[in-house]
């Protein structure tokens, strides 16, 4: 199961490369993360480190439009919250913690532009070692491993006490902190997920959290989650323990609860609603011109089963 989860990062990287190759991430707010340049450099190094992983990414430029739309939406939805966090705390020392970071490279543009940010990437040991080796091979990206504001550490998020101890060691709990969990919590057991959420909310006094995951669907006739789960078992020997439990945006969001004396706000929506309500009309037109999309109903069904969640809390508002 652990190895199967780690391999999902190759899928995520391939999807990101496809969306970059087809220019989905060349406009809108994602321009600020310079994905084409950063991932181009990363792939060049990846080729030297792991031809197996590189080979899977190399041919990903032909992803179906509906898949590129999905990658675009999850990327910009998280980018939006990262930029908002940075803008709201532009004069303060802050922290960003990406749990289950995989090959995500947001830290490159964030650290290049914001000297007030400490950026912590956490994932399984094998994933972290691959990322470290790839970064080291790059004359450009290797500098981030020497940056005092960047931390790349291995941990098993299911071991909640160890994870919280690591966070307490690397972070200052009193500083504003943004947690990112992108398609991560869905692979964790419910008990450990809840314990991790509760522990992080207790640890950081002024925190924000953006999370993206699939959800099974709450309608009794909705078979999306059941079919997805069965396909993952058959093809990947992979489980999503909470897919059918946290099957609506409201249930998904209910796991984040404040301590009694905290200011707390919470926003959650499915990705189809996000696309319709949050993506500007001109941006919709831009991506529409990139590839012909004739599966609009399929896009609606798929994105209705993914959720973007955001919350922030402050235990010391005064």
UniProtKB/Swiss-Prot annotation:
Got any disulfides in this one, which pairs? none
Q: Which UniProt keywords apply?
A: Methyltransferase, S-adenosyl-L-methionine, Transferase
Residues that coordinate or bind S-adenosyl-L-methionine: 74, 100, 123, 156-157, 182
Molecular function terms, GO-annotated: protein C-terminal leucine carboxyl O-methyltransferase activity
Q: Which SUPFAM superfamilies match?
A: S-adenosyl-L-methionine-dependent methyltransferases
* GO biological process terms, semicolon-separated: methylation; protein-containing complex assembly; regulation of autophagy
Q: Which reaction does it catalyse?
A: [phosphatase 2A protein]-C-terminal L-leucine + S-adenosyl-L-methionine = [phosphatase 2A protein]-C-terminal L-leucine methyl ester + S-adenosyl-L-homocysteine
Catalytic activity, EC: 2.1.1.233
Q: Which domain of life is it from?
A: Eukaryota
Q: Where is the signal peptide?
A: none
Query: Where is the chain membrane-spanning?
Result: none
- The record's top EC class is transferase
* Protein family: Belongs to the methyltransferase superfamily. LCMT family.
Q: What does this protein do?
A: Methylates the carboxyl group of the C-terminal leucine residue of protein phosphatase 2A catalytic subunits to form alpha-leucine ester residues.
Q: What is this protein called?
A: Leucine carboxyl methyltransferase 1
């Amino acid at each position: 199961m652990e190895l199967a989860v780690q391999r999902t990062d190759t899928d995520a990287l391939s999807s990101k490369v496809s969306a970059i190759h087809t220019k989905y991430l060349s406009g809108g707010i994602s321009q600020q993360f310079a994905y084409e340049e950063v991932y181009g450099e990363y792939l060049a190094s990846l080729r030297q480190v792991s031809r197996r992983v590189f080979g899977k990414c190399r041919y990903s430029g032909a992803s179906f439009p509906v898949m590129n739309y999905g990658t675009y939406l999850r990327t910009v939805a998280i980018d939006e919250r990262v930029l908002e966090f940075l803008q709201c705390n532009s004069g303060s020392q802050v922290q960003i913690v990406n749990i289950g970071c995989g090959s995500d490279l947001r830290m490159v543009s964030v650290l290049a532009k914001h000297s007030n940010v400490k950026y912590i990437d956490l994932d399984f040991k094998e994933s972290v070692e691959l990322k470290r080796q790839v970064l080291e091979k790059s004359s450009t990206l290797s500098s981030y491993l020497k940056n005092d504001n960047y931390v790349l550490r291995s941990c098993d998020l299911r071991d909640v006490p160890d994870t919280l101890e690591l966070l307490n060691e690397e972070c200052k709990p009193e500083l504003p902190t943004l947690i990112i969990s992108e398609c991560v919590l869905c692979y964790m057991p419910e008990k450990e997920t809840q314990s991790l959420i509760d522990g992080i909310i207790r640890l950081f006094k002024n925190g924000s959290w953006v999370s993206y995951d699939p959800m099974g669907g709450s309608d009794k006739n909705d078979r999306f989650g059941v079919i997805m789960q069965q396909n993952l078992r058959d093809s990947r020997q992979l489980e999503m323990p909470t897919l059918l439990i946290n099957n609506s945006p409201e249930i998904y969001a209910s796991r984040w609860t404040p301590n009694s004396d905290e200011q707390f706000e919470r926003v959650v929506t499915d990705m189809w609603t996000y696309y319709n309500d949050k993506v500007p009309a001109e941006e919709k037109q831009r991506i529409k011109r990139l590839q012909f999309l004739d599966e609009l109903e399929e896009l609606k069904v798929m994105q209705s089963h993914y959720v973007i969640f955001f919350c922030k809390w402050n235990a010391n508002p005064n």
